[in-house]
């Protein structure tokens, strides 16, 4: 376990203790559920102030079953970093970054009346298709906003999608992660 602690220490030193965990993967794999559980078990218990704790709980993303895309844009959770102390007295200021993810076959929410749903984003002066915005936001989480990337995948056993539905989107995420070095 010694090497595990030195990894935390190395990250804490290089980032001045600020850790942004980018949670990426295809849509409808459980990214927001992962963030919700991480918040409940690691982040929220480390918040001392009851008002800050309540606000952090309110900032936790929603999660739901089904084929409907729930996340619509990248989101930093919690809004303010929370200090977590590891077993070896290494302190890290942690925030998670949620994203829409790359589109999977049979997901719903990116089309409206059989045409691409158009959205305005901070990255464009004009409306772009939701699917394109989701890809841009996911790439930004991977390349611009994360100290550590966590990829969430699914085998189709707990969703209304098949394993095959996820494969192309997973390959896109893997390609993006590998490109970061």
Give residue spans per PLM region.
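Conserved C-terminal guanine-recognition region of P-loop GTPase G domains, centered on the G4
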Residues: 83, 87-89, 113-181
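Conserved G1/Walker A P-loop phosphate-binding module
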Residues: 1-127, 143-145
